[in-house]
Amino acid sequence: MLEKTAFNAPDGQPYQLVQLTNSNGMTVQFMDWGATWLSCKVPVNGELREVLLGCKVEDYPNQTAYLGASVGRYANRIANAQFELGERTIHLVANQGKHQLHGGKEGFDKRRWKVEECGQNFVRFSLVSPDGDQGFEGNVQVNVLYTLTDENSVKIEYEAESDKDTALNLTNHAYFNLENAEQGNDVRNHTLRLNADFYLPVDGEGIPNSPLKHVVNTSFDFRVAKPIAQDFQQGEQVVTKGYDHSFIVNKAWQKPCVLLTSPNEDLSLEVLTSQAALQVYTGNYLAGTPTREDGTYQDFSGIALETQCLPDTPNHPEWQNYGGIQKAGERYYQWTEFRFK
């Protein structure tokens, strides 16, 4: 169940891989480097279909798309790589121009996580992020639990605790293509429905530049299912080359916040979450990212559905009721479930 590769990660040690299989033959694979979700093969019409974008294990340190990685300490962007915490200004490591993206140059995706335990249907990884890591305050202990169910669901649970107040926002950066992630099909031909009434406008650098807006009469209205391509790159999407925006999830944990359906409707993905927001990214800059088969992905080859809090929340007290600032000694816990049908 736990396999070591013949080649080494940047720390000089082999990658460790874990594969899980359910009673239907669905298989998922994970890696300790970045606590990464490597592969997801779902039974469709008697065959296994790869629905997760990925590359060769040895190529993961060199790709910049965060394929399937656990992202932290703060997923998404923090403007100008700084924010106020109490009476202090916290200065972070910038890694996207003057901003910080996904936790900095050495975020959680670039760390060796410890395999704490694994079984037939689960694996749990842990990581210690020290005080000062990428500029963030506090020693943070993080755990992620991946579980594969016999209902063809993958559940991801993040748990953390810090000894100081800190910014904290964890997510998984998987890219999905239900038609077949190996063939490079354009994900814009999928149908998408979002249980979301509000979205967050951003500028060309992905930094919020407006209060939350209602989706009515905009290209961000997915309350009724529509092809992703239908209103693509209209209006505010022009500066981001497509969808790369956060939506506030209408709170009903027992109901999916996402329904993604393949073009011929032979496979769908429902997403349920305890998180307040969802970042929808249509792979606008995937071109050149390595595949598993010695090729490269094109733009729009997959869609990331990143459950999280809002970007740049540490600089926006008005959004902190959605999460983003973790108090010392308090338990951080959130879950997301991906259901394939």
Where do the protein language model's features map onto the residues?
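An exposed, glycine/acidic-rich loop-and-rim segment of catalytic or binding clefts
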Residues: M1-K341
